[in-house]
Curated annotation (Swiss-Prot):
Expressed at a high level in brain, heart, liver and stomach. The active site is at C12. It comes from the Eukaryota. GO terms for biological process: 'de novo' AMP biosynthetic process; 'de novo' IMP biosynthetic process; 'de novo' XMP biosynthetic process; animal organ regeneration; cellular response to insulin stimulus; cellular response to xenobiotic stimulus; G1/S transition of mitotic cell cycle; glutamine catabolic process. Binds 1 Mg(2+) ion per subunit. Binds 1 [4Fe-4S] cluster per subunit. It catalyses: 5-phospho-beta-D-ribosylamine + L-glutamate + diphosphate = 5-phospho-alpha-D-ribose 1-diphosphate + L-glutamine + H2O. The gene is Ppat. It comes from Rattus norvegicus. This is Amidophosphoribosyltransferase. The modification N-acetylmethionine is found at M1. Pfam families: GATase_6 (PF13522). The lineage of its organism: Eukaryota, Metazoa, Chordata, Craniata, Vertebrata. Its cofactor is Mg(2+); [4Fe-4S] cluster.
Length: 517
């Protein structure tokens, strides 16, 4: 998200909650949001923030933000600052080195002519530089280097056609989506509603859940008419711990209004020139938690299929299959099942060391590798290991692991990667470094096995990855359900053919939209 940095990029989690029925509510909104953010902690570990509101005609926004993990930022004393509240939004953030500052923590809050709004954003604007200049030309100051603040200011900026006494927030959101085609998922809070917005390409994930009465949580067959509230989240994995039931994804280009009365679709903004959907395929490969649902399929299942496809494409004579824990475990199980080899653990993980890929400093990454793994040498001494990893970005993690395994008695170590080589940076919200830093673009890639110290290295093909992701997704005509609501019938794509599509730009260099740099 940081405009001046051309290397590592952000990956964040957004969350929102609103109580149903009469207000003031008995629902503990700040705690629900906190638990939701804990469920999204893997999407960002450097800062977190929550903004709550009582939802009155002149609402008071209560804000708390801080650096660090969610549980460190939101102590019981800090949560007291967020009461009394009937709705709120939250954010957990990853940022670049030098930009990990409190001023860049989200959600952002701005005062507008028609009251305050709060915005939390996951993604990165592909035309951020141009939009920044536009705001500055109109005399709108920006206090941070984050394009999330730009989104907030663009929403606050009154469109020329809007009258002072008739704010039209849907028109403002549509204007933003026209100005910025990608990439973002947003939660926007104004007075007594939350808007959930996904860019027309659907590049970043967003879904909606229903807070159930405690007595109904574990009864999936029971169709309770009671609803304690509604939640919106980057991933569905955050729902179980708060007693929410997954409802549906926010569609690409969809603007959803969530109020105490329910959920309704206000509009769907189409993509230009009939472009396909471009959901980030790397969410399946690495970023998402395995129990999350995208496109009506579980991430774990897709990773398992990737492992099976990898076994077809890259078999090898070996004694056992193992994994670099933990995100590659489903792929390793799929590989082992397909080739008929036992799955055996060879590494144990220190769960209190952060993921090396999303720590923004090279030295922190390398130290993380050294502290992150222990070896279970009794399981593999004298044996040939097929070690499955989900991705190799720089090669900083896998090389020390191979050395560690061989020094601990492994006869051979064959690396199989359950995704294709990453060759291009992502400019749409994922932490992928510059082309020069990527191992796939270095001269050493021609002799990668020797360079890493492995006996062999083979990646899953792009075709194999896409096939594994898409094979269970149904291609069919979809009608946007009215979901107990009224949809504005404006001929704007509310009934359309929605074929699946995935962004593979980091693998192929084919970006779904033109980049403005």
């Amino acid at each position: 998200m940081e405009l001046e940095e051309s290397g590592i990029r952000e990956e964040c989690g957004v969350f929102g909650c609103i109580a149903s029925g009469d207000w003031p509510t008995q629902l503990d909104v700040p705690h629900v949001i906190t638990l939701g953010l804990v469920g999204l902690q893997h999407r960002g570990q450097e800062s977190a923030g929550i903004v709550t509101s009582d939802g009155s005609s002149v609402p008071k926004f209560r804000v708390h933000k801080g650096m660090g993990l969610v549980n460190h930022v939101f102590t019981e004393d800090n949560l007291k600052k967020l009461y009394v509240s009937n709705l709120g939004i939250g954010h957990t953030r990853y940022a670049t080195t030098g930009k990990c500052e409190l001023e860049n923590c989200q959600p952002f809050v701005v005062e507008t002519l028609h009251g305050k709004i709060a915005v939390a954003h996951n993604g990165e604007l592909v035309n951020a530089a141009r939009l920044r200049k536009k705001l500055l030309r109109h005399g709108i100051g920006l206090s941070t280097s984050s394009d999330s603040e730009m989104i907030t200011q663009l929403l606050a900026y009154t469109p020329p056609q809007e009258q002072d006494d008739t704010p039209d927030w849907v028109a403002r959101i549509k204007n933003l989506m026209k100005e910025a085609p990608a990439a973002y998922s947003l939660v926007i809070m104004h007075r007594d509603v939350i808007y959930a917005v996904r860019d027309p390409y659907g590049n970043r994930p967003l879904c909606i859940g229903r807070l159930m009465p405690v007595s109904d949580i574990n009864d999936k067959e029971k169709k309770s008419s009671e609803t304690e509230g509604w939640v919106v989240s980057s991933e569905s994995c955050s729902f179980l711990s708060i007693g929410a039931r997954y409802c549906h994804e926010v569609k690409p280009g969809e603007i959803v209004e969530i109020s105490r009365h329910g959920v309704r679709t206000l509009d769907i903004i189409p993509r230009s020139n009939g472009d396909p959907v471009a959901f980030c395929i790397f969410e399946y490969v690495y970023f998402a938690r395995p129990d999350s649902m995208f496109e009506d399929q579980m991430v774990y299942t897709v990773r398992y299929r990737c492992g099976q496809q990898l076994a077809v494409e890259a078999p090898v004579e070996a004694d056992l299959v193992s994994t670099v824990p933990e995100s590659a475990t489903p792929a390793a199980l799929g590989y082992a099942t397909k080739c008929g080899l036992p799955y055996v653990e060879v590494l144990c993980k220190n769960r209190y060391v952060g993921r090396t890929f999303i720590q923004p400093n090279m030295r922190l990454r390398q130290l993380g590798v050294a502290k992150k793994f222990g070896v279970l040498s009794d399981n593999f001494k004298g044996k040939r290991i097929v070690l499955i990893d989900d991705s190799i970005v720089r090669g900083n993690t896998i090389s020390p692991i191979i050395k560690l395994l061989k020094e601990s008695g492994a006869k051979e170590v064959h690396i199989r990667v359950a995704s294709p080589p990453i060759k291009h940076p992502c400019f749409m919200g994922i932490n992928i470094p510059t082309k020069e830093e990527l191992i796939a673009n270095k001269p050493e890639f021609e002799y990668l096995a020797e360079y890493l110290g492995a006996n062999s290295v083979v990646y899953l093909s792009v075709e194999g990855l896409v096939s594994s992701v898409q094979q269970e997704i149904k291609f069919k005509k979809q009608k946007v359900k009215k979901r107990d609501i009224t949809i504005q019938e404006n001929g704007n794509g509310l009934e359309y053919f929605e074929k699946t599509g995935h962004c593979t730009a980091c693998l192929t260099g084919q970006y779904p939209v033109d980049l403005e740099w």
